[in-house]
């Protein structure tokens, strides 16, 4: 019996391997090989090893502080648009800003958003990142309604209060891991915007599970992963259930409250401003959003609000620390604002608009740090670009990083130089030509990009006017599975005044 079972298992495994090899061989020709014949000239490149392609080479490069060689070497051999094979399928990589611009603008027509199956499963099919067409348009519009108004006085006051509340937990002379502290701020802010829950045991428990979920984004989602909880992907799947479950409980309770109130939310039926995103969803389109849609949507906004903004905060401090002249100029700008307002007055929109050098620092941090390395798209139709045809169904990766760090577009591109943004036409030209695309572009332009700038600006204001700091040890950046520092960027803090109230 045991021998027969083993033989059966071996046969099944052999069939799976043969099927995977055949799939890989078919990918060499691709879906357009028969359809287009000789006209289907794919961008040049290499599919790497059978089954795994060049995935291990890409991961190996992006787990270092200098992942550029992976793309640079292939661009040198094949040009700005080349073919590789990563994460289980053939993928066209673009380091060409003109082609990237085409891809961003063609969302919903020639291409659609497409990400590795691990991300799709963990975020949910109804998430903002993965929905398409009319569904994406309505979610994007709702996000803009809630997060695209950073000038709102209540929101500014809440950001200011939350940043200071986190800093009050730091000892007058403390060592903190800045990346972790920044993530607490952005996570708590996002949770507040989503479900109106203040920081506490519930939010911290949710955050711990959420970190496990994020770790699984670029892991290999093999079929039995859900049965193997010791794997990164298995742990991420379990964490996803817990995070979704916690959000679902809040949403269910709010739906019940709405039903008890005869279809209205709360006592003040005439109020113009919704208190959070769940309320926006419950009221939108006559309450047509399902429970699962709301769960997936809220979970995806946690990703957008948590990982990217917190890394922007961390990298801004890291790059400023490594560039003393920039730090000195930033301190002067914020000291002037503090002196005009008084230390205990919360920041207002007019103060934010009085931070021009801060915006230069944020732009340069986005350009050099490349928190979002690029975006995945899938061709809805055959795409003809220059002498190449990218067939329908092919995965495409538009690399923002390759463009941002190209000396053809930025002088000494790999040097942190915030002063380059003080020349207004430089910024306008870069943005207008889609050479500077840290928040994407086209219909999928990040709806919370201005809010992210406001959060980082307020954080930097309170940090530089209340603390001095120094790195406790050398820490380096890596870019897989997400952009982060290996040690969380530990720094020694020293309070500059007696109180940070």
UniProtKB/Swiss-Prot annotation:
Disruption phenotype: No visible phenotype under normal growth conditions.
Keyword Nucleus set for record: no
UniProt record, GO biological process: brassinosteroid biosynthetic process; brassinosteroid homeostasis
Subcellular localization: Membrane
Enzyme superclass (EC): oxidoreductase
Residues holding heme: 446
Domain of life: Eukaryota
Keywords noted in UniProt: Brassinosteroid biosynthesis, Heme, Iron, Lipid biosynthesis, Lipid metabolism, Membrane, Metal-binding, Monooxygenase, Oxidoreductase, Steroid biosynthesis, Transmembrane, Transmembrane helix
Coiled-coil region list: none
SUPFAM superfamilies per the UniProt record, alphabetical: Cytochrome P450
Pfam family, one: p450
EC number: 1.14.99.-
Cofactor: heme
Transmembrane segment boundaries: 2-22
Topology within the bilayer: Single-pass membrane protein
Function: Catalyzes the C23-alpha-hydroxylation step in brassinosteroid biosynthesis. Converts 6-deoxocathasterone (6-deoxoCT) to 6-deoxoteasterone (6-deoxoTE) in the late C6-oxidation pathway and cathasterone (CT) to teasterone (TE) in the early C6-oxidation pathway of brassinolide (BL) biosynthesis.
Family assignment from sequence similarity: Belongs to the cytochrome P450 family.
Protein name as it appears in the record: Cytochrome P450 90A3
Gene: CYP90A3
């Amino acid at each position: 019996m045991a021998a027969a079972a083993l033989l059966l298992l071996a046969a099944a495994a052999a069939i799976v391997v043969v099927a995977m090899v055949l799939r890989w061989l078919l990918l060499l020709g691709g879906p357009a090989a028969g359809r287009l014949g000789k006209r289907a000239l794919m961008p040049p490149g290499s599919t790497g090893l059978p089954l795994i392609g060049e995935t291990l080479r890409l991961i190996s490069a992006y787990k270092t502080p200098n992942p550029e060689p992976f793309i640079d070497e292939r661009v040198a051999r094949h040009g700005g648009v080349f073919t590789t094979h990563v994460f289980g399928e053939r993928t066209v990589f673009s380091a060409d800003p003109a082609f990237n611009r085409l891809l961003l603008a063609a969302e919903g027509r020639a291409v659609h958003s497409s990400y590795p199956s691990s991300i799709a499963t963990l975020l949910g099919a109804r998430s903002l990142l993965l929905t398409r067409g009319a569904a994406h348009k309505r979610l994007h519009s709702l996000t803009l309604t809630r997060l695209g108004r950073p000038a709102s006085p209540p929101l500014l006051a809440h950001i200011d209060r939350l940043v200071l509340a986190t800093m009050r937990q730091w000892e007058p002379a403390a060592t903190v891991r800045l990346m972790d502290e920044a993530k607490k701020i952005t996570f708590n802010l996002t949770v507040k915007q989503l479900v109106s829950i203040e920081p506490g045991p519930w939010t911290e428990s949710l955050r711990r599970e959420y970190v496990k979920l994020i770790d699984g984004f670029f892991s290999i989602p093999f079929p039995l992963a859900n049965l193997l909880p010791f794997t990164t992907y298995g742990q991420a799947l379990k964490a996803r259930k817990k995070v979704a479950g916690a959000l679902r409980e809040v949403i269910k309770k709010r739906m019940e409250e709405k039903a008890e109130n005869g279809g209205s939310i709360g006592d003040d039926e005439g109020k113009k401003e919704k208190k959070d995103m769940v309320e926006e969803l419950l009221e939108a389109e006559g309450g047509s959003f399902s429970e699962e849609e709301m769960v997936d949507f809220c979970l995806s906004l946690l990703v957008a609000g948590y990982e990217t903004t917190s890394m922007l905060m961390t990298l801004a401090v890291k790059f400023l620390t490594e560039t003393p002249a920039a730090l000195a100029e930033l301190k002067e700008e914020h000291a002037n604002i503090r002196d005009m307002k008084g230390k205990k007055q919360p920041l207002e929109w007019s103060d934010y608009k009085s931070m021009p050098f801060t915006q230069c620092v944020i732009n340069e941090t986005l350009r050099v740090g490349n928190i979002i390395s690029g975006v995945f798209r899938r061709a809805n139709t055959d795409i003809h670009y220059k002498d190449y045809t990218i067939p329908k169904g092919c995965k495409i990766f538009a690399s923002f990083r390759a463009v941002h760090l190209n000396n053809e577009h930025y002088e000494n591109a790999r040097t942190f130089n915030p002063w380059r943004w003080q020349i207004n036409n430089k910024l306008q030209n870069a943005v207008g030509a889609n050479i500077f695309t840290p928040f994407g572009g086209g219909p999928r332009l990040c709806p919370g990009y201005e809010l992210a700038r406001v959060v980082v600006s307020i954080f930097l204001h309170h940090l530089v006017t209340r603390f001095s700091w120094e790195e406790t040890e050398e820490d380096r950046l890596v870019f897989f599975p997400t952009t982060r520092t290996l040690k969380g960027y530990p720094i020694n803090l020293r309070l500059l005044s007696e109180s940070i109230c």
